[in-house]
Amino acid sequence: MSDTRLRPRFRRRIVALLLLALTVGLGLVVHTALPDIAATDIAGDALYAIAVYLFVVLLTPRMSPLFVGGIAAVWCVGIELFQLTGIPEAVGAVFSPAMLVLGTVFDARDLVIYLVALAIVVA
């Protein structure tokens, strides 16, 4: 493989990693430092979806943004539906950082927020 083919993927990974770190940092600020109101819940959900998108870009930098957005949407919807089982809440009670990845309770509004955030990122 030539160097010129590796460089764009490498650059895309570096950019995705930096943006992912920034997104996770913002998410933690929203989660820990701001009041727990609807606006921060919406912001946190949007940042979660964006973080998932960036993580997929980090793993697969050659995929098209639309395909990456689709994978991120499937993950976000799957995690939200998984919350209907009560397992994420139980895991979060034992290991609280898991709540940041798995959430706790199902909220249909979250599904809309994930999809809107991903549509904006992909556009």
Label each residue range with its predicted role.
Residues 1-123:
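Bulky hydrophobic segments
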